[in-house]
Design a protein with these regions (language model features):
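Sec/Tat-exported extracytoplasmic proteins
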Residues: 5-8, 20-27, 91, 124-132
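Structural microenvironment flanking redox-active thiols in thiol-disulfide oxidoreductases
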Residues: 13-54, 65-73
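Short active-site neighborhood of thiol/selenol oxidoreductases, capturing the structured segment around
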Residues: 1-13, 19, 32-33, 112
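A short beta-strand-turn-helix
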Residues: 1, 21-25, 98-101
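Solvent-exposed coil/turn segments that connect beta secondary-structure elements
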Residues: 7, 37-40, 62-64, 92-93
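Short, internal strand/loop/helix patches
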Residues: 49-92
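Structural recognition of the beta-strand scaffold that forms the well-ordered cores
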Residues: 1-3, 31-35, 58-61, 86
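Thiol-/selenol-based redox modules, centered on thioredoxin-like
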Residues: 82-135
Length: 135
């Protein structure tokens, strides 16, 4: 899962510890990578964000993040990302359908805004399949 976040973003701060718990619970079958977006900050600011808000998964503060994010948005045909956090999930290089946290009847290729960890876990269980659920 790729999580596009900002150190300034209130929902990003609120869900960081929950994302860490989700990653730890599923670490044998799941990788979570956070990419800073909409800001240019030092690595120290990102470390401080991680320590303050419990974001203990891989965080990238690379200048290449914008290029990666642009490619992801093009891949899923999402025109203008203007809100953080924003997440996509891939399995075997294929973007996965995710529940819409605003409309339970719809699915899409991304999460927009803060998403309840229970919803992400439900989607992860579906993505990882029956073999995973047995482990």
């Amino acid at each position: 899962m790729l999580d596009f976040f900002g150190t300034f973003c209130a929902p990003c701060k609120q869900e960081a510890a929950h994302l860490t718990q989700l990653w730890r619970k599923n670490a044998q079958n799941f990788v979570l990578v956070g990419l800073t977006h909409f800001e240019e900050v030092s690595d120290e600011v990102v470390r401080e964000f991680a320590n303050t808000f419990g974001a203990y998964y891989f965080l990238s503060n690379s200048k290449q993040n914008a290029r990666i994010i642009a490619q992801v948005l093009q891949d899923i045909n999402y025109q203008r990302m203007e809100q953080l956090p924003f997440k996509v999930a891939l399995k075997d290089g294929v973007y996965q359908q995710l529940s819409n946290n605003f409309d339970k009847e719809k699915k899409g290729y991304f999460y927009l805004g803060a998403v309840p960890s229970e919803l992400m876990q439900k989607d992860l269980n579906a993505i990882l399949g029956k073999e995973y659920a047995k482990n």
